[in-house]
Structure formats: C-alpha cells, structure tokens
A protein has these predicted regions:
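Catalytic palm subdomain of template-directed nucleic-acid polymerases
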Residues: 550-570
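Short active-site loop/helix that positions an aromatic residue
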Residues: 234-244, 427-441
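Short Gly/Ser/Thr- and Asp/Glu-enriched loop/turn motifs at secondary-structure junctions
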Residues: 68-70, 544-549, 587-591
Length: 771
C-alpha cells in the first residue's frame, strides 16, 4: 500500500533489539504511526584516533573524510545511549550530536511530506506501518487543530475548567453538528447544557474532569493543539496536575502519554511532547513570523488583529472575577473560557499561522511545531549534501577560533530635517553575498585552484560548494512564491535564507569560523561603502546607511515623478556598475540586487541626545505618495515608552512634516497632562527578566512597582506617582506630572524641535508657570 502523509511528531527510544523510531503523520485517510525498528545509531571518528568502543559497537572504514582531508571511520551502535556515553567520555567524535530520528529523515531528504510504502494495519482510529519504506513527496496537509485553554484558581494549583474549540475549516462550515462540537469541562454539579456553539459539561472533581477531557480529545482526534502560552501554562499545568493525581496525561494519539520537558538552563523554553499531535503556541508562532505588537497578551493581540478581545481583561480584576464566576456563575466562566479558544483560532486564521508553520517545516525539515532551531535547520539542509560530496562534519563546539566577526555596517548619519530622501535597498544582502562570493564551509576547507578571496585570509572554491546552490534554490522558490502571492511561503523562505549568516556566525554551529562570518559581514561593509561612494559621484549625498540600505538626499525641489525617475535610474545604474565591477575584479557573476525601495517626501534624522553627532537606527519620515508616517527606533516606535510620549511624538511629526502649526498642540498636550486629562496614557509597561529578589542595588522603577503586587507576572504595568512607582492595579497616589513632562514629552519633542530652532521648554515654560 502507498500512502502520502505529513509528519507531525518524531521520537526515538532504545529497545533491547536496538533503536526504534516512532513517527506520527496525518493523511487524507487518517492518522498514521510509523515504527522503524532495529536502527543503528551512527557517528564518525578520525581514522587515526584509537578508541575503546562499548560492547556491540562496530567500527568500519568509510570512503568519507573530514573537510581538511583526514579519513574517517563510521561507528555503529546497538543503542543510542551507548553513543551518548562515548560522547560524554570526551572522545573526539564527528556528528555524534545529530539526533537519530533527524539523521534518518535528512539522509532521505524527507522534510515533512512523506510517501509511505508498506503494510498498513488499522489500530483503533489510526493506521500503523512497521518497517515502511519512506521517501520525500509533494503533499499539502489539511491539519485538524484544537485550541485549548484552562482556568485555575489564580496562582494556586486548583483546576476550574478546560475549554477546547476546533478551528473552523471548510468541513466544519458545511456540517452544522461540527460547528457546535466545542466543549467546556467544568468542575461542579450543574446540568450539562448546549450554550451556542459549545457544550458545557460538569465533572465532580479534577481527576474526572481531566479524564473526560482526554477521552473527548481522543475521540475528536486533532492533528495539532494550539493555545496562548499553551506549553508554558496550560499543558505544563495539566501534566503536573496528572502527576499529582497519579493519572496518565493521555493527550497523545492512541492514548500515549504527553509530557512537558522542563528547561535545563534559565531562559530556555519548555518543550511539549504529545505523540501524534503537533503543539503550536500562538505567541511563539507570531514571533517566529516577525509579527510585532506592543504586547503579546491574548487580549492585546486579538484587539490589534481582530478588533475584539477577551471577556475579562484587567490582570488583577481577572483573578478575582474568575474566582467569583466559579463560585457564583459557572456558565459565565465557561463563556469566558471558550472565548479564549475562539480568539486563538481566529488569530491563527487571520495571521495564516498554520500555513507559515507548514511552509517552514517543508523548507527546513524541522519538526512541524519546532520554533527557533536555525542551526538544526542548517544541518538538515547541509549535512546530507556534504556527505554526498564525500565529507563529514565535526561536532558542535569541537573547533572554534574563538574570534567574532563584525556586525552589519551602520554608516554615520548626517542629522537634519530633509525633503526627498530615497532609500536604495540591497535585496537579501547577506544571502546574495553568499551566492555571489561562494561563501561555504566546504568551499573554505577545500578551495581548489583559482579560489576566490574572502576576508581574514579566507579563500573559497569557485565550483565545489554547497551553500550558494542552496541559496539559489531558495531564492528561485521565493520569487515563485511572490509571483503566486503565497505570503506564508515567501516569508518562511526569507527567514530561512537570512538565518544562514546568523548560523555561520554563532559558536553553536558546527561550521563556525571567523573567516566564514567575516567574509559575509565585511563584504557587506565594502558593498555599502562603495555604493555610497558611487552614488555621491553621481552628485547625490548619502546621509545614512544601515546594513543593507543607503539613504540618498536628492534635493528639496524634486516632485514625486522626478524622485521616482532618479530612484529608478540610480537602482539600474548601480546594479550595472556592480555587475561590471565584479566581473572585472573577480571574474564572477553578481547576484547583488539593488532595489529602489522608498521615497520619503519628508525625513528626519536626529542627533544622539545631547550631542551634535547623528544617531544610528533612529529616524522618521513620510513615505510618498500616500504620506504614511514611518518611525524607526524613536520614542513613538518603542513600547517601553508611555502611550503619552508615543502618541504625542507621532502627532508632532505629522504636523512638522506637513508644515502645520505645532506650538499650540504642544501647549495643549502639556496643559491636558497637568489637568489630569491624559492619565490613561501615563502607563509604562516593562518586562521583568529576573526574579524580583535578584534586584538589590539600583532597583529600577518597574521592579519597585512589581514588588508592591501580591503576585507579579513577566510584565508589569505601572505609573510614576508623587510617591514613586505604583502598579496600575494598586495605584493610590496622584501621577507625578512633572516627571512625564521632563522624561516623556520633552525628550520626544526636542529631537526634532532643535532643527526648528526651538524646544519643548521654550514653548511650554510660560504656560506651565500657571500650574
């Protein structure tokens, strides 16, 4: 039997007979469990190194070698723990850190879609195949996902309820019964009832509630679980509650036990292991896709994306209100509980997060729900190609020159208030450098004849390399995705391509080398500075440059059409110049691609505060032709500044850029602030990155405020009052309006006002003497 499917989860375990891999996949015919038994864990060792092997392990000579030419042997083990013990003994091994299930898939070029050939047997509500033949295939899954959310008694360990909502799709829209299949399990003795699209079901105690939820999930059989902080809170709580009650957490397919792996290091994430079901956290997926919000709370994100939010929003009120509802009005608590699930589903649909996750897995070969993992993704793509070229790679951290490489080039800016600034941007600069200049670990180790020079004495092979070809494939795929308006795929490819430099520049990469990283970043510096010189030779000053962009001032008098003509001509001529320059200097084809990106009709480049020099990575402007305001790095774009400063600065920029009166506006805001009319805009919101007790000296204001709460979370909302910092939920004192004048409004205004030969103080001093 042949069946096309999509990998959801992957696990391995040692058995007396050898290593066993367990893969779960979804297909048009249902879930599939693939058991691959009698596998031999493998790694490599330099042939000249003597090694004492554990019983049952075998050492075989291979035709492969290390990148610098040393011949290697393969080491084959009965169990993965034997390989790990040898690795922990300090033996110098190669690729011993590659997980066996990842190696099995990557060497077959299987990423997520998979063709299964073999004998498939029905086991309950899923298929099982033992020792199937697997190969890559083009297959697009239709994931059935379930949003879950729990309610508890504040910070105690008491469980109140669990809500679960199936994400709507074409199937649920067509079937009225499926549209009403969501559920809330609630501890209590009330009558079960259908409440709109969900059913409220009461259970006598926590154990009964959890088992009812597990049974319902097994019957519903989703391919993935979703939620908001679903691993760190919901699943972690459920797993720990099961442990305390002495029951298995039967959330996996086939009733397999789910676990949550706790972090080994501070700041590391918890990892959910739910056999047969991917687990997607909405916060993590949005961040992986480079979405940006003032706050990633469910209430804030849903308001920004959907225009609606939770039924209870205030953090302090929320705990008390949930406790009250559980005591007095359980149906209302159920409404609140299921509402969170509905919001999660709607956010996933609005942001197309499942499509992004699927495309990312298709590109990288990482597990569907694994986020981060840029180094592992690089290994998945690079190692199989390296092996086929005849080489193996070292372990991570087995070699390092210990030196870093410079970051992206940021040009000194020319501060001022401008008309008509054009931005020329190098499209995917670092990937295009890798492709153009053949930056590659194998090409660095084996440069061959007539190599291409890099930096830090690096030389790169012109023809025997891997990474430039990978970039070329991804580049073409992204261009195709853009043409087909496939935004999730285009974004996923962009993220993967841009991650390659970061991977080569980190000591967590097995190929890390200062020569590799510097040959990318220092080439980028050269490209930006030489492009600046060429543009200025054409008669246009470059007022700023940042990693992959140059900002060109073309004079005050150009209209929109003239600006576009100048921008397009600079783009075309600079591309031609780079093609000719690289052909003459290195005899290579340029894959550098300059784009005319933006015309700022008005542009502001500030100084460093209190100094005459121009700042970096901070500017604002109006983009023509629709006069859209863009703010980068300034107060209006920073979430650690108050809404007061951010709103004030944006409006001030609008007035200055449109040459409208602004003095009266500044006076009005200062007056409203002093009169207490803007108090709702005075809230600071900051993240708490350490335990409160860790702050001993110079305790910052947000920690002072957090210490006044009975319980603090990872973020704190507070005001500066006449009695110091106070949390929003326990504010008793009047705001310190002078603080907000001096520390919020004045800095937000003075950056641009200095170029108009005035200041916040000059405009407001006479007025404020009345207060």
């Amino acid at each position: 039997m042949i069946l096309d499917a999509y990998l959801l989860t992957r696990h391995w375990r040692d058995t007396p007979q050898g290593l066993e891999l367990s893969l779960w996949a979804c297909s048009e015919q249902g879930a599939v469990n693939l058991l691959i038994r009698d596998q031999q864990p493998v790694c490599f060792v330099e042939r000249s190194l003597p090694l004492a092997l554990p019983a049952g392990a075998v050492r075989k000579p291979l035709t492969l070698s290390l990148l610098h030419g040393e011949a290697v042997d393969g080491l084959y083990f009965r169990q993965q723990r034997d390989l790990q013990h040898l690795r922990q003994s300090g033996a110098t091994l190669c690729e011993s850190d590659v997980k066996p299930v990842d190696r099995y898939l990557m060497e077959r070029f299987i990423r997520a879609p998979v063709r299964i050939e073999g004998d498939l047997q029905r086991v309950g509500n899923y298929w099982r195949a033992i020792q199937p033949r697997l190969q890559p295939v083009d297959f697009q899954p239709r994931l059935r996902t379930l949003a879950i959310d729990i309610e508890t008694r504040g910070h105690s360990r008491q469980l109140y309820s669990i809500a679960a909502a199936i994400m709507p799709d074409a199937t649920t829209e067509e079937d009225p019964e499926l549209r009403q299949s969501d559920v809330v399990f609630m501890i209590g003795t009330g009558e079960d009832e259908q409440r709109g699209h969900y059913r409220l079901i009461y259970q006598a105690n926590e154990k009964a509630l959890l088992n009812a939820f597990f049974n319902w999930t097994l019957e519903t059989d989703p391919d993935a679980l979703t939620g908001w902080a679903v691993v760190n809170f919901d699943l972690n709580f459920i797993v720990q509650k099961c442990q305390s009650l002495g029951i298995p957490c039967r959330l996996g397919r086939g009733g397999e036990t789910a676990t949550v792996l706790q972090p080994n290091l501070p700041g590391s994430p918890r990892i959910a292991r739910v056999p047969g079901r991917a687990v997607f956290d909405g916060i993590d997926l949005l961040k992986a896709g480079f979405w940006s919000f003032d706050s990633f709370s469910l209430d804030n994100v849903s308001h920004e994306l959907l225009g609606t939010g939770k039924l209870i929003s205030s953090e302090q009120d929320k705990v008390a209100e949930i406790n009250r509802l559980f005591k007095d009005d359980k149906p209302q608590l159920a409404d609140y509980n299921i509402r969170d699930c509905t919001l999660v589903n709607e956010i996933f649909q609005k942001a197309d997060l499942l499509a992004f996750a699927i495309q990312r897995a298709n590109l990288t070969g990482l597990a569907l729900d694994r986020l981060g993992g840029s180094v592992a993704a690089f290994d998945n793509l690079y190692l199989p190609r390296l092996h086929r070229a005849g080489y193996v790679a070292p372990d991570v951290n087995s070699r390092s020159d210990g030196l870093g490489s410079p970051g992206g080039y940021v040009m000194d800016s020319v501060p001022g208030l401008y008309k008509n600034v054009l931005v020329l941007d190098f499209k995917s600069l670092y990937p295009s450098i890798i492709r153009t200049f053949f930056i590659d670990p194998m090409g660095l180790a084996v440069p061959g004849d007539n190599p291409l020079p890099g930096f830090v004495d690096a030389m790169f092979a012109r023809d025997k390399h891997i990474l430039p070809g990978l970039i070329e494939e991804l580049w073409a795929a992204r261009d195709k995705a853009k043409l087909e308006k496939n935004a999730p795929l285009s974004q996923a490819i962009k993220i993967i391509m841009n991650s390659f430099y970061g991977v080569l520049g980190t000591t967590g990469c097995r190929f890390y080398s200062q020569q590799l990283a510097s040959s990318i970043t220092r080439r980028g510096h050269e490209i930006i500075t030489r492009s600046r010189d060429w543009i200025e030779e054409q008669g246009f000053p470059v007022i700023y440059g940042d990693t992959d962009s140059v900002f060109v001032y073309i004079g005050d008098d150009a209209n929109e059409q003239q600006s576009a003509d100048i921008g397009n001509k600079l783009m075309q001529d600079l591309n031609i110049w780079w093609q000719e320059e690289l052909r003459q200097q290195y005899d290579i084809e340029s894959h550098l691609e300059v784009e005319y990106e933006t015309h700022y009709s008005r542009f502001f480049m500030p100084t460093v505060r209190g100094m005459p020099t121009g700042s970096k990575k901070r500017y604002a402007g109006l983009i023509a032709p629709d006069s859209r305001l863009v703010v980068k790095g300034l107060e209006a774009a920073r979430t650690d500044w108050t809404p007061l400063a951010r709103n004030f600065q944006r409006e001030l920029f609008q007035r200055v850029f449109h040459e409208q009166p602004f003095e009266e506006y500044i006076r009005q805001i200062a007056e409203q602030l002093q009169a207490g009319e803007l108090d709702e805009q005075l809230i600071y919101r900051k993240r708490i990155r350490r335990a409160l007790d860790d702050y001993q000296r110079n305790v910052p204001p947000h920690i002072q405020a957090a210490r006044k709460l009975p319980h603090s979370g990872r973020t704190i909302s507070y005001l500066i009052t006449r009695n110091g910092p106070e949390p929003v939920d326990l504010q008793h004192s009047t705001p310190d309006y002078q603080h907000y004048l001096d520390k919020q409004l004045a800095p937000a205004a003075d950056g641009i006002l200095q170029f108009l030969e005035t200041s916040f103080a000059a405009i407001t001093d006479a007025q404020l003497q009345m207060f």
